[in-house]
């Protein structure tokens, strides 16, 4: 078996957990990962603001019963997740949030 790099291992774990959709903003930290999404069967939905991505992921999970992933960038992008995280928490909605190392 060929060795996986970090990005390939990350995407493989997403597949193992049934992630099919990711919402958010891709920055330079996520470029290598986002390049692997199409082959892995993960659709990325680019949004204008991280908060939108979080709210869309919450709605997607509530309407389908399948977990979605949100992606944010450092700094203000991460703080844009506050409202969607709290909304998902109070509604008991599972959500995977991913941010680059800050």
Task: Give the predicted meaning of each segment.
Residues 1-102:
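N-terminal alpha/beta PP-like core and its mobile active-site loop of ThDP/TPP-dependent enzymes
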């Amino acid at each position: 078996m060929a060795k996986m790099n970090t990005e390939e291992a990350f995407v493989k774990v997403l597949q193992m957990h049934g992630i099919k959709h990711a919402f958010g903003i891709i920055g330079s930290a996520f470029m290598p990962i986002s390049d692997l999404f199409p082959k892995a069967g993960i659709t990325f939905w680019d949004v204008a603001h991280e908060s939108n991505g979080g709210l869309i992921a919450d709605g997607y999970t509530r309407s389908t019963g399948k977990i979605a992933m949100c992606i944010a960038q450092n700094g203000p992008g991460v703080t844009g997740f506050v409202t969607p995280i709290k909304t998902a928490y109070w509604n008991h909605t599972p959500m995977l949030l991913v941010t680059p190392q800050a």
